[in-house]
Structures are given as structure tokens and as C-alpha cells.
Amino acid sequence: MFASRIRSRALGLHPRARFENTRLPASTTGRRYKSDETLNRVSSKITQPKSQGASQAMLYATGLTEEDMSKPQVGISSVWFEGNPCNMHLHDLSAIVRDSVHRAGLVPMRFNSVGVSDGISMGTKGMRYSLQSRELIADGIETVMNAQWYDANVSLPGCDKNMPGVLMAMGRTNRPSIMVYGGSIKPGCSAKGQKLDLVSAFQSYGQFITGQIDEKERFDIIRNACPGRGACGGMYTANTLATAIETMGMTVPGSSSCPADDPKKLVECENIGEVVKTMLREDIKPRDVLTRQAFENAMIVVNILGGSTNAVLHLIAIADSVGIKLTIDDFQAVSDKTPFLADLKPSGKYLMNDLYNIGGTPALLKYLLKEGLIDGSGITVTGKTMKENVASWPDFPADQDIIRPLSNPIKPSGHLQILRGSLAPGGSVGKITGKEGLRFEGTAKCYDYEDAFIESLERGEIKKGEKTVVIIRYEGPKGGPGMPEMLKPSAAIMGAGLGQDVALLTDGRFSGGSHGFLIGHIVPEAMEGGPIALARDGDRIVIDAEERVVDLDIPTEELEKRRKEWKAPPLRYQKGTLKKYCTLVSDASHGCVTDGPI
């Protein structure tokens, strides 16, 4: 308790903040409890047998007592590193979680995972490591949990790939597990009073090179866009995944929408030990929570919120980890019946902090349950159902305009569209909010890597008024490698005022912060000889979101001629972790998993 007071003071929080109501629901009495003596059924494999005396000697050396040897051990995995605002505070949060777990009569064991800052690496070769870091996080947590024989897991992620990484590890190990989201950043503010976020910084480059802002204005934006700790503030990838994971029931209510520097985030951590103990006593495991219905709910909420296309990749991969086969066509079926309601960035004007101020994710789930859009009957990590979790949560204020009523949606169907056609026979993912139109025809300009397009834009080769389909290829899971995100190009297009004139196609991915007429995840990728590798400058490209078609409009004979002439380029990496990734990774339509899709 004394240590908790010190941390609260260090973070500038009033001592009472530690005791605020975080609306953690009381444990249900409907499930059968196990006695405390059986809660260490995993760790007892090394703490009890006389034949494991060396294991016990090592544990005594870490500070465990004789009494501790009969208690459950909880692995607390933090994706902490100092070089990223999304993650820089997670070590402090994990210390609060550690103390909470200890107070609950359990043995906390902290360990760390690797991470990549998508915002820092974006537009550089470093971005090739981003998606691959999801696998490293999953592999690392799985490794420690299994090798150390921990009974339960608490994971604290912050940046984009962290969330699916920790969930995949939970699915693989299938021990009582819970996620504590690090929370999102609060908005920045320019000298002119303009609300800013990280995407403002990305778009400032396009504004600068087209003369819309000068150097002083550009620097003001990048200096003030990110005011402190927390993940990027819009409905970008981190917040999309955190919200989806809360929807599925793998966090306590409110975890996904509570800002990183809000006192209630500390309270969430203070209370997590009792939640873990409930999961252990009731034997609530990830595969009990992560059901097909839970994934259905998550896909609905992603479409309601206008969330990141990365949700397609990551939810497929998480489902794979618990033995559920989720497909890109499942996303299309959900999108067809789900309205797009949220006026959130990148396509709207509000941030996650604004949603938090009107009740956050629990208020959203309560609203969607009331409207019959999601199913609230599934069990969650609290031991209660989603419906029970949010029953006492306040409704949205009557005058809020962040979440539209069903009678007035931004778009009557979802923004995530699965497109196929002669350019993407294995599928692709479009982010079509309706603002950019539903059909685009234009002339192809092809680039074999991201920077080649940026250089072309700087030379003024992309003209306003001309309908251009920019194709950035050899950026897929194997070709990139790592399927880097094209936020730098998409933000430059929007910043340059070319959003109505340019569509962007790629076998890479898009950041959750991207918006415009965007089609990514094209399968087969260029490195595997997909039709995207065969497109040439001047080809006519047709994209029809209503018909869900993306076509390379050239004669079949010409396409076959080009196919025979095409030769696969060498892999960009011949040694190291990315070489291993290229060897193992599945295609985008199967989630880019590296342990073989089910």
C-alpha cells in the first residue's frame, strides 16, 4: 500500500484516485468455484514435487517463501520500452498490477516483451519489423508462460501490434488471462488552438510540400501533436484492437477507452488482482471467452466505429490461436449488415478521449445491446456476461454527436469491404467510409517500394484533376517483408489535397490513421507473382466498392504474356529475423500467422 501511495504521488494523482469506483462488477455466484488449494495446478508442477528441488531452490532465490510455494503464480507481461509514448508508462502500471496481485494472495512474476513503435518506424525500413513484432510478442509470452509454469497471465500492451500479440499468446496457452490496455494519449493543441494528434503530424508533410503551410506551422504541429503518454488518440489500430478486445470480454469494463494518464487507469491496475483470483477460482480461460459469438461482436463494433483495416488481420490471427477459423468473408458478411455510426478520426473529427468523456466503450456496448446489434450473453474475464458488466453503466448523454443514432448513420453498411477481382483474386481489404465515393476508375502509376512514390509526389508527378491509381507493391508479408503500413503515402496524398483524385492500392497494409480511397492486403502479393506485380503505368484500374471488385482492365492475353515475362526478385533479407518471417508467414487473407493457419 505504501508503494502504491508513492507511485500515485509520482504520477501527480490525488490519493483518493486509488479508491475511485472503476465499475468492476461483483463476481458471479453462478459458476462453481475451485478451492484456493487447487488454484496453483500449473505452477505446482515445479513447486511441489521433491524431484523438482532445483526449481524450488531457484524460486527461493527470487525471494519466494515456503508459504508462496503453494500459491498460484501469475505472469505479468508488459510490452514496456521507453522509446514510445504508447509504451513508456507500462512498467509503472505493471508495478501496480504486481502489488494488486500480491494483495490478492497470489505470487506476481513480472517479465517484459519486445515492441515496435509504428509511429516512429512509419515510412522507414523499420516498419518492416512492425507486424513481425506481433509474432515475437506472442511467441515470447507463450514461451515464458509455459517454460515458467505460470498459472495465469496479466498482459499490459500499448502500441498497435501489442494487443493482438498478447491475445494470441493467451489463446495459445489457454490459462486464465486478462489484458490491461495502456490507454490512449490525450489530444495535442497547436499555437492556433487546433486539436492535434499523430496523424496531424503525418499530414503536415503533404501540406508543407504543396505550400499550404510554412515551416513554422509545420514545426508547431509536430512539436505539439503528442503531449504525453498513451497510444495514438483516434480510432486507429491500437484503439480499434483495444475496443474489439474489450468487446470480446478479455478486459475489465472501460479498459479500452480510459486514457493513459487518467487516474482511473491506475485504479484498474489496483483492482486487477481480485479479478485474476476470480478467473483462477472459476477456471475462466481465454477459450471460454473468445467464442465465435465474441468475434462476431468484435467485427460488428469495428464496423460501427470505423476502425482500422488491421482488425481484419489481427482478429483472424487471434481466432486462429483459439482454434476458430475466421475468414475475410466473415468480415464482409458483418459489414453488409452493420451501420457505420462513429464520427471518430481518421475519417471523422473526434478522438477516443471524446468517446471516454461520454461513457466510453461500456456505454457504447450498452447502447448496441439495447439496439440488438450485439449479443451480450457470453462470459467475460470478470466472471459475468457483457450484459451484466455494463448494466449499471450510464447511458450516452442525449446531446452527444459522436455516435450517431441508427436512424442517421454515416453509412448504412460497414466501411470495411472485401474486394476481389483480376487484380486481387485472393482478396483485398478496402476502407470505404463513403466520403471518398464508392467507385474509382483511373490510370495506374506503379511503384515497387514506398519511397519511390513519395519521391514522385515531391516532383509533382501526381496531378490534381487527373484520376490516378497509385500502386505500391512488393510491400506484402514476404515482399516488404512484414507488410509495412502505408500511412506516410496516404497521409501525404490527403495532406496534398489529392484525396478526390488518387486511389491507393497496395499489397502492404494501412495504418488505422489512414483515410482516403484505400485498398490494401492484396492477395496474392507481388512477391508471389500476383497480378499486382504485372500492372504497368497507364493501365486502367477499376475499383467498385458496391460490387466489391478491383480489376486490372487489360486483355487476358496481355496479362498472361506479362506473367510469363515476370521473374521473382530476391528476398530483401537473406538472414535474421525477417528472413525467418518470410519463410513462415501466411498471406494476408489468412492473418499473416507464422504457425500455420488452421
Swiss-Prot record:
The record's free-text note on cofactor binding: Binds 1 [2Fe-2S] cluster per subunit.
One GO cellular component, as annotated: mitochondrion
Molecular function GO labels: 2 iron, 2 sulfur cluster binding; dihydroxy-acid dehydratase activity; metal ion binding
Keywords on record: 2Fe-2S, Amino-acid biosynthesis, Branched-chain amino acid biosynthesis, Iron, Iron-sulfur, Lyase, Magnesium, Metal-binding, Mitochondrion, Transit peptide
Localization annotation: Mitochondrion
Pfam families: ILV_EDD_C, ILVD_EDD_N
Catalytic site: 511
Record-listed Mg(2+) binding positions: 118, 160, 485
Top EC category: lyase
Cofactor dependency: [2Fe-2S] cluster; Mg(2+)
InterPro entries assigned to the protein according to its UniProt record, in alphabetical order: DHAD_IlvD/Edd (IPR050165), Dihydro-acid_dehy_C (IPR042096), DihydroxyA_deHydtase (IPR004404), DiOHA_6PGluconate_deHydtase_CS (IPR020558), ILV_EDD_C (IPR056740), ILV_EDD_N (IPR000581), IlvD/EDD_N (IPR037237)
Swiss-Prot/TrEMBL GO biological process terms: isoleucine biosynthetic process; L-valine biosynthetic process
Recorded metabolic or biological pathway in which this protein acts: Amino-acid biosynthesis; L-isoleucine biosynthesis; L-isoleucine from 2-oxobutanoate: step 3/4; Amino-acid biosynthesis; L-valine biosynthesis; L-valine from pyruvate: step 3/4
Transit sequence range: 1-111
Entry binding sites for [2Fe-2S] cluster: 86, 159, 232
Record's keyword annotation contains Repeat: no
Annotated region described as Disordered, given as residue ranges: 23-50
SUPFAM superfamilies: IlvD/EDD N-terminal domain-like, LeuD/IlvD-like
Compositionally biased residues, Polar residues: 40-50
PANTHER family per UniProt: DIHYDROXY-ACID DEHYDRATASE DAD, DIHYDROXY-ACID DEHYDRATASE, MITOCHONDRIAL
Function, in words: Dihydroxyacid dehydratase; part of the gene cluster that mediates the biosynthesis of the sesquiterpenoid aspterric acid (AA), an inhibitor of dihydroxy-acid dehydratase (DHAD) effective as an herbicide. Performs the third step in the common pathway leading to biosynthesis of branched-chain amino acids.
Family: Belongs to the IlvD/Edd family.
Name of the protein in its database record: Dihydroxy-acid dehydratase astD, mitochondrial
Provenance organism: Aspergillus terreus (strain NIH 2624 / FGSC A1156)
Designated gene of the protein: astD
